[in-house]
């Protein structure tokens, strides 16, 4: 069959949601296209497999590199992106974070009706099944299973206690009443298994007769006739053949913040200057395609630990490593059930800010270069991440060849405020590490090291060592009708093209304060109702800490 009502490009966090919800209508045919394969790998299922997935190019990882970064000593940065069913939800760190309520109220204030916190909270709740049951902020019956941090490792509780000793708030639920403070993470893990968007949304509906899923196919362009998307051209990686598939109703582009703009550009939709430079005929001029790229930049501060309780000792040697895999594969038991990242914090680098601008992830290992460098010492890391970048980058073309990687210009730390916030984050986490609660677990600061003290020294270390923490958004951003740089409207329809929507992290107008998997799933849940002509879920005014409300 070469004609479907809906064609979804990309089986990632958003595409899996759309495939599930749109195929609920038995009279509609749905085609889900995925360039990668299925998600049957043990490394995907096993939470401890995350390190082996995120650090190298392979069947589950596109493994992109940025162009040289001018503010990071001209380095090209590693950009892992998920490939295959589940997309990046199949290779990420499994941290379930929605962002701050004011992130979404900011979208509404930008003129994007229906995107305030009260509007999106019902869709977060609909998607979620929180271990132990729901409450005012959490769902209990959704496809996405979410658990609470459960590791008994004392470093997690010690970092939270040290945060309190340093004078920072504590919180029990980053996704509830109060985001700010130190506390435990919630995780997309269920019964010791990764719970990706594919696991939650796609697998349960694979038997539906109106849903067709193709893997190993690259979408080379979207077909436009008389101002309407009529279908797609795909390339089969096995047969090396191209074919055209028609869409009766809509084409839904859910290829992510890197590849959604790239596919639009290959289709002749984008900035005419960019298209002309690569000999691509302009089908529809839309200057904002690929612009407005935002991402969370991150540095890894690490401390050596005198106790053999971190990933190095727990996995040291071939026998232990094989034992972890075998115990998990045969019995579903042991360290394979953990992703070694269960506590963290959301903090403000200045007291005048209305919400946190720093996020901390505590990892039970000395992290260097996305875990590619194995440090033969026990230790732990504070990932220090700047949440609200003022810097903007872009995604462009390297060539007109649809099989070429896109060109990624992240443009990290171009703004002084971004540099100031990250520098302050380094100082704040040193203050936390100096507290008595962490004293039994620290012998020395591994990185940046005691010789890095002045602003200039910290800035130089950041330029040498900063990396992505994998949250790119904004390259097909949502906006109002008068916004020349907006790519889609508040219903994710591509401006000026009928029958075409972008539904993924690329539509976020501003980067939310936290990990981006849960917000991407929420966006797809919300837009699936729009596509189906269903009324939006009623707004939900759950209380959130702010002016006039007392902190927890």
Regions of interest found by a model, annotated:
Residues 1-552:
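N-terminal redox-cofactor-binding region of secreted/periplasmic oxidoreductases
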